[in-house]
A protein has these predicted regions:
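Trp/Phe/Arg-rich N-terminal binding region typifying the photolyase-homology
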Residues: 1-83
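A charged, amphipathic alpha-helical module
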Residues: 67, 71-186
Length: 186
């Protein structure tokens, strides 16, 4: 994960890294900390310390890290981040998550309306959209389109694919599952 993330970033094959002005990292492992240090040679990096336990002290530390990150972003972009903007961003992201969850729900049907790889292409593709407010509507429209095509896929074993990250390499896993008679449902 670390090696491929770093490689994609420094070779400009990762659109997230390519289009970013700053990388926000976290301290989940020593390998990632080193990766962020090396990425700092290419772009500004801010690393957030994650608390090791869920405690009052850990929550205090996490709140301080969030505030520090906000201050770094405000200075870098010369823009004061208001509480109103944060609330709005939360609403936008929650609407996107809700629409994606609703889209995934169609894969619960006895007769599936689409292949898992098609579903993955839809949702993965939307991660590259810069108009975050439009995403929920796009997902809803895609869901309606899929359901209107009236496909009835049956007789396949349903497979749930999880992990971190669910990125480009996941496509190969889904293809393997579906080329061997299964179907990735989420």
């Amino acid at each position: 994960l670390i090696k491929s993330s770093y490689g994609f970033a420094i070779t400009n094959k990762c659109p997230f890294f390519y289009f970013s002005d700053i990388v926000i990292g976290e301290t989940t492992c020593d390998g990632k900390k080193k990766m962020y240090e090396l990425l700092g040679r290419h772009k500004p990096v801010h690393v957030m310390e994650l608390p090791n336990r869920n405690s009052e002290m850990g929550m205090k530390m996490w709140k301080e890290e969030i505030i520090k990150c906000k201050e770094v972003l405000e200075e870098m972009f010369d823009h004061k981040i208001t509480d109103e903007e944060i609330r709005h961003a939360i609403k936008v992201k929650n609407a996107e998550r809700s629409a994606a969850k609703d889209f995934y729900e169609i894969m619960k049907a006895d007769e599936l309306p689409m292949m898992g790889l098609d579903m993955w292409h839809v949702l993965h593709g939307l991660t590259f959209s810069f108009d975050k407010e439009a995403i929920p509507g796009e997902i809803k429209s895609l869901k309606e389109k899929v359901l209107s095509e009236n496909k009835h896929i049956t007789g396949r074993k349903r497979i749930l694919i999880t992990g971190c990250p669910i990125g480009g390499a996941t496509e190969k896993v889904i293809e393997s599952v579906e080329n061997n008679g299964g179907i990735a449902v989420a």
